[in-house]
Amino acid sequence: MARRSLFSLMAVLAAAAAIDSVPVSLEAQQAPAAAPPADAAQVAYGRSLAVLGDCEGCHNRPGGQPLAGGLPLNTPFGVIYSANITPDHDTGIGTWTADDFWNALHRGVRANGAKLYPAFPYPYFTHATRAESDALYAYFRTVAPVSYRPPANRLPFPFNIRFLVTFWNMLNFKEDTAPTTGPTPGEHIVRGLGHCGACHTPKTALGGDKKGRELEGGKLDNWFAPALTGDVRAGLGAWPAADIAEYLKTGRNARANASGPMGDVVSHSSSKMADAEVQAIAAYLKTQTARLETPAAPAPDPKVMAVGQAIYVDECAACHAVDGKAAPTYFPPLPGAAVTQSRDPTTVLRFILSGTQTVATDARPTPLSMPSFAWKLDDAQVAAVATYVRNSWGNQAPAVSAGEVAKLRRKVAAKPVQKPSAVI
């Protein structure tokens, strides 16, 4: 949301803060009773839930100790550093009770009563059951405590005022007062701990999920997460459930390779899930119909297509083949690819400008790389080749302009590589 719009709401927000000041403490007082002492089975269950929630993906920083936090999370409103969730008493959650943990997971409230920023995806985690919360808590109590205090968040005024989250919650958060593990295991994972919509659902100006647009694809920090609906061109409509499960488990299938932020998800989370879990996710995603099928795009300029084809033959065909079919499971095919035909070309442009590397998993231990072409191709050339691959071999997608490329090039060059987060 533009800052002037947010400032115009300051009076309302201040009132919301005043109203919120008492209920915060009441939430902590009225929380359910503390969980009983953990046993080995509960800890093991919690460890598996931490995998489902991709906790390492945000709470591990490069070169840091496991779950000690400090990873910078890019949001549209500034940078937030992930928390230390080890049981260290001074810098982690070592003094938290099971009730404190439940309040954080379920309501977005810290042990001291302050609101959590929804970069921590409590709007999804609220669907976790109390038994799941207690198991996660039991597991985190067993990890090695690390004395490490993450850097202070870098949020400009007024986004650095935590009580503004109260207003955000009014618009975007509904606590699940009776969470269950149903109706299907896949739905519980996707809508709950898996928090797939945090990236794959389009966002409002304030960073909340757009209502009625679940899993239709979302833009975040110079990436576009494609739709997970039944959209045939820009979603998973052409993917059998087995292909979805294979992609989540191994990072590759005959249609796509995981890299970028999704590569992190596969590395830390889905590749470590049980086969039954990835199969359940796949089965649920196949029930998501395309509420808004991607419309056909106008035919691109033939001159631009000719320029793009020449660049493609010179620079891309060696790996992706002249017909775009490449070598499936090694170099992803381009015909019919959702990421290629998405309404937003950001990820395709990001691959061309920055290059990418596929994730390494136990099933596919050798990562494969695509080089950066930012040094070699100017904005018009990148736009031309992107337009070409988005509109060849049966693909249809809007043409890309040199201006779009220039804008993304500046953003990518200006920011260090950090973990993206769709909301604050």
List the model feature ranges, each with a label.
Residues 107-110, 250-254, 354:
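Glycine-rich, acidic and aromatic/proline-enriched surface loops and short helix-turn segments
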Residues 18-33:
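Signal peptide processing junction and immediate N-terminal pro/mature segment
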Residues 309-350, 366:
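C-terminal structural cap/anchor segments
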Residues 241, 248, 335-384:
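Extended, polar beta-sheet/loop recognition surfaces of beta-rich domains
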Residues 30-35, 39-41, 52, 60-80, ...:
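Flexible coil segments in periplasmic/lumen-exposed cytochrome c-class electron-transfer proteins
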Residues 1-12, 18-22:
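Bacterial N-terminal signal peptides that target proteins for export
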Residues 93-109, 113, 135, 237-241:
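Aromatic- and charge-enriched surface segment that lines or borders ligand/interaction sites
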Residues 79-87, 223-229:
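Acidic/histidine-rich, surface-exposed loop or edge segments in extracytoplasmic proteins
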